[in-house]
Amino acid sequence: MIKRALISVFDKTGILDLAKFLESRDVEIISTGGTYKHLKENGVKVIDIEEVTGFPEMLDGRVKTLNPLIHGGILAIRDNEEHMKVIEEKGIKPIDMVVVNLYPFFNKVEEDLSFDEKVEFIDIGGPTMIRAAAKNFKDVVVLTDTKDYENVINEIKENNQVNIKTKKKLAGKVFNLMSAYDAAISNFLLEEEYPEYLTLSYKKNMDLRYGENPHQTAAYYTSTVGKYPMKNFKKLNGKELSYNNIKDMDIAWKTVCEFKEVACCALKHNTPCGVAIGDTIQEVYTKAYECDPISIFGGIVAFNRKVDKETAENLIKIFLEIVVAPDFDEDALEVLKTKKNLRVIKCEEKSTQDKDMTKVDGGILVQQSDNKLLEDTKVVTEKSPTEKEMNDLIFGMKVVKYVKSNAIVVIKDGMAKGIGGGQVNRIWAAKEALDRAGDGVVLASDAFFPFGDVAEEAAKWGIKAIIQPGGSIRDEESIKVCNEKGISMVFTGVRHFKH
């Protein structure tokens, strides 16, 4: 039975209802600082923690609850005679419930505060109390999540106590919270690219209907700190997002964020099927659609500019899963909402391209994101690309970064007309891209040509310029073919494998 509770919360959501319920059951309530004031002002009978400890709040609030009279009452095992004898001798009363939520370090670390100001939001007393309560969960109910208040109230109403299964779950939530909280603090203080221990702080954003396939369960977690596009987007219309939707949306958004120009990316199964740049939203959508009018069906379309009504009217002519953009005209949004299942996503944050992580069985691979497009760019053939061809070549390299290797993209007039990816050899990727493009002008490759066969194939389709990293021991074979066929070729010095 709960006879004594300690309440100290930053987030006061629901705390009055809980406190008044406890008071109605003759539970003695101890509290601190702002929580004490809040409860007292709202008519709850409450004891200031200073009356229990005999010590005033110290060091600008850094020391309030760090006292044996508090922690002895939390940690004492009730069926341990020696424990109970000791706390009785020391005048310590057991504390049966601890209700604490922490200083909002997750939020404050993102605000425009000084380093020292952020440090002040690292909670010490709160974590110490909830860890103690969680360790002694058989005897102490610990609440850190406002969403758990109602369930605990109902259990007490029905059974006059909280069952051990619930207590254990609540204790587990403490250590789950603390691992995320401590991870955020650790990463803030260390600022190391590859620390000795990789601690990640993510919170469940939503449960998903299923994973990549219907037989796989899934959930979506977002970072507790930092501003990221796939964390802060807003769904303005449509069904709930799926696992595949979020993965695809991430790549589509990253692709359009590569460009300063107005850009559109159509994407299916995590692979771009049409990408274009131009002067207007309507133009780039039309060009992206024309890249592959078959594959775009059931896919995702992303823009890096506000969507207008005219473009929206064209978007709803075909079946799409998602339209994502930094904003939508009011008229455009009304048009898109006529498709009730179409997910319309407003994404204002630019792609951060921070770190890439890939889980393997028993480990996580961590690497810098592929942020470097070019390094030592040089023309290696007798012929140089024209300015227009060079612009298309650079465009092609920005696109090919997001195509699974081996990857080839064929470009014409700011359109990725042919995309060949996911092939186990480069010539197959080239043939696929060239065949899809039909009449492309330039070609971009994510990695070097191991032989001269790609250049030979490109020549058959009338390609005028090629861009690739270079670095093969047989580079001269490709250079020779290009010189013989009148093709210009540029080496970038940067490979863009994507697996």
UniProtKB/Swiss-Prot annotation:
SMART domains: AICARFT_IMPCHas, MGS. It comes from the Bacteria. Signal peptide: none annotated. Its EC number is 2.1.2.3, 3.5.4.10. SUPFAM superfamilies: Cytidine deaminase-like, Methylglyoxal synthase-like. Pathway: Purine metabolism; IMP biosynthesis via de novo pathway; 5-formamido-1-(5-phospho-D-ribosyl)imidazole-4-carboxamide from 5-amino-1-(5-phospho-D-ribosyl)imidazole-4-carboxamide (10-formyl THF route): step 1/1; Purine metabolism; IMP biosynthesis via de novo pathway; IMP from 5-formamido-1-(5-phospho-D-ribosyl)imidazole-4-carboxamide: step 1/1. GO terms for molecular function: IMP cyclohydrolase activity; phosphoribosylaminoimidazolecarboxamide formyltransferase activity. GO terms for biological process: 'de novo' IMP biosynthetic process. InterPro entries: AICAR_Tfase_dup_dom_sf, Cytidine_deaminase-like, MGS-like_dom, MGS-like_dom_sf, PurH-like. Belongs to the PurH family. The IMP cyclohydrolase activity resides in the N-terminal region. The gene is purH. This is Bifunctional purine biosynthesis protein PurH.
